[in-house]
Amino acid sequence: MHRCVGGVCVSLIVCAFLTETLGMVIAAKEKRGWTLNSAGYLLGPHAIDSHRSLSDKHGLAGKREMPLDEDFKTGALRIADEDVVHTIIDFLSYLKLKEIGALDSLPSSLTSEEISQP
């Protein structure tokens, strides 16, 4: 009985050792400290580029406080994007109708004479 308990304990220790050496850790290690990416995000590009501290900058100026580009402030970009999306949807609808043969029964396009006649 004592041999079985001892064998189980030894096998558990060996399994734990193998998983640790192969990189398969059971519990993830806690990450600590600052990385360049986290410092750059929190402090902003000005602090990283010129190596100034927070006291020199008088506060945080991270990405959250940076002004947006002017392209994104205007609504013209959004309208243009919506027009492109509508054009693509219309084209795909046309292709689908053409595929199922629904366009064959429609008359051909109108000529300029037919448009000018009331």
Swiss-Prot record:
GO molecular function annotation: galanin receptor activity; galanin receptor binding; neuropeptide hormone activity; type 1 galanin receptor binding; type 2 galanin receptor binding; type 3 galanin receptor binding
Annotated positions of the Alanine amide modification: 61
Signal peptide: 1-19
GO CC entries: extracellular space; neuronal cell body; secretory granule
Record PROSITE patterns: GALANIN
Domain of life the protein comes from: Eukaryota
Predominant localisation class: secreted
Expression across tissues: Strongly expressed in brain and stomach, moderately in the eye, and very weakly in heart, kidney and gills. Not detected in liver.
Residues cleaved off as propeptide: 20-30
SMART domains to which the protein is assigned, alphabetical: Galanin (SM00071)
An individual GO BP term: response to light stimulus
Cited InterPro entries: Galanin, Galanin_pre, GMAP
Protein's cellular compartments: Secreted
Keywords, sorted A to Z: Amidation, Cleavage on pair of basic residues, Hormone, Neuropeptide, Secreted, Signal
Pfam families: Galanin, GMAP
Annotated family: Belongs to the galanin family.
Chain's role: Endocrine hormone of the central and peripheral nervous systems that binds and activates the G protein-coupled receptors GALR1 (galr1a and galr1b) and GALR2 (galr2a and galr2b). This small neuropeptide may regulate diverse physiologic functions including contraction of smooth muscle of the gastrointestinal and genitourinary tract, growth hormone and insulin release and adrenal secretion.
Stated name of the protein: Galanin peptides
